[in-house]
C-alpha cells in the first residue's frame, strides 16, 4: 500500500463534486493521473440529516466554512437543527405537516477503486441520529453528536475503536471493497 505522499502528491486534492461519489471519483482519478496510472482508491464521506434535507452532505468537512473546523461544523449543525425543529413545531401548531422533522441522520462513505484502469464503487452507511449536545472525547468530526442505531445510549465519540470500526460507514465500505478484491483477485 502506497500513500499519495509517497508518490509525490502532497497538495490538497480538489473536491468540487456535488455528490460523495463524484468527489470520491475525482480524488481517485487525480491520484491515478498524478501517480502514473497506478492502481488506487480514494473515498469521500459525508453526514446527511433528514431535517436539513441531506445537509451537510458533501459539504460536511467545510459546513461552517473553508477552514474545516470540526467544532464550528458541530455548532452550525446543532443550531440549524434547533432552528428547523422550532419551525416545525410552529407549523404543527397551525396544522401543517412537517415531513422529515426528525433528528435522523446517517454517515455515508463512497470509495472509488481504480484497478487496471477500471473504476469500481463501494458504499458504506451508518444510520443513527443527532444528539442535542456534544458527548464523548473519542473519534473526530461529528462523532460527539452522532448516536448510531447499534449503540442508542451513547455517541460514537464514546465508543471504543473496535466498536466504532465494526459499525462505521467507512469500515463497511472498506470491507465491501476488500471482499470484492478477494473475489476478483482469485479469477
Residues of each region from the PLM?
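Anionic-ligand binding patches
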Residues: 1-187
Amino acid at each position: 500500500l502506497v500513500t499519495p505522499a509517497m508518490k509525490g502528491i502532497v497538495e490538497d486534492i480538489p473536491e468540487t463534486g456535488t455528490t460523495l461519489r463524484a468527489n470520491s471519483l475525482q480524488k481517485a482519478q487525480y491520484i491515478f493521473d498524478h501517480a502514473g496510472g497506478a492502481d488506487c482508491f480514494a473515498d469521500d464521506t459525508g453526514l446527511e440529516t433528514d431535517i436539513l434535507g441531506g445537509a451537510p452532505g458533501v459539504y460536511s468537512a467545510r459546513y461552517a466554512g473553508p477552514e474545516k473546523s470540526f467544532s464550528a461544523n458541530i455548532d452550525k449543525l446543532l443550531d440549524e437543527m434547533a432552528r428547523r425543529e422550532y419551525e416545525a413545531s410552529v407549523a404543527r401548531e397551525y396544522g401543517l405537516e412537517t415531513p422529515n422533522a426528525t433528528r435522523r441522520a446517517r454517515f455515508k462513505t463512497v470509495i472509488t477503486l481504480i484497478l487496471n484502469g477500471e473504476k469500481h464503487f463501494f458504499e458504506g452507511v451508518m444510520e443513527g441520529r443527532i444528539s442535542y449536545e456534544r458527548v464523548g472525547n473519542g473519534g473526530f468530526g461529528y462523532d460527539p453528536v452522532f448516536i448510531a442505531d447499534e449503540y442508542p445510549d451513547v455517541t460514537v465519540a464514546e465508543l471504543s475503536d473496535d466498536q466504532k470500526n465494526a459499525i462505521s460507514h467507512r469500515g463497511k465500505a472498506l470491507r465491501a471493497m476488500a471482499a470484492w478484491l478477494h473475489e476478483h483477485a482469485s479469477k
